[in-house]
Amino acid sequence: MNPRPGYRRSARSLEPMGLRSEVNRDVRLATPGEFAVPRIGPLEVWPPVVLAPMAGVTNAPFRTMCREFGAGLYVSEMVTARGLVDGHLKTTRLAHFAPEESPRSIQLYGTEPDSIGRAVDMLVGEGRVDHVDMNFGCPMPKVTRRGGGAAIPLKPRLFEAIVRAAVERSGDVPVTVKFRKGTDDDHLTFLEAGRIAEAVGASAVSLHARTAEQ
């Protein structure tokens, strides 16, 4: 797909041609080579912009459209590990990537280490993904009330077991972890979650700097 009109794109450059932010109009444009190329495991993320995963939004057509703007990584909408393991057709479709999509980045959600491990083993073993992002940020009350989503880091042992299951079954495919500050201001879990994720081998973490309540 051709870059968006007004941009000149190469493997490591995306140069605005006369376009400036209205907010940061006094900030100079970066020069080639000024910033090191960010890496997530073996993946180079350039330009250093990531399309954040969002259920019902970051599907294949939306990711295709966003590639015109030149982000370096496009994460799929949330896919449930249990649905993949059980072979649900709708879930399987969510885990599909177009031939031109690279790297193929999927966000996986689950509350059981076993199903997470099996789902990652399936995705990696079949060569279907280049990156797995673990979702611990869902703020929906119907999810957090049952101990899922953003509430999982409240249970450090479960959180560690889930992340470890993904990392141990991922082979050379990098695993990242997305989480929030916590469930509310009285239950902030992000520091411990980040330390645990690093300790068990996650390649990177992503912090949604709000609580689930917010």
Region roles according to the model:
Residues 11, 15, 22-27:
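Acidic, Ala/Val/Gly-enriched low-complexity intrinsically disordered segments
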Residues 26-39, 54-130:
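Glycine-rich, positively charged N-terminal anion/phosphate-binding segment
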Residues 38-50, 82-103, 138-148, 170-178:
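N-terminal small/glycine-rich loop or linker at the start of catalytic domains
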Residues 48-50, 73-75, 103-107, 131-133, ...:
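Structural preference for beta-strand elements that scaffold enzyme active sites
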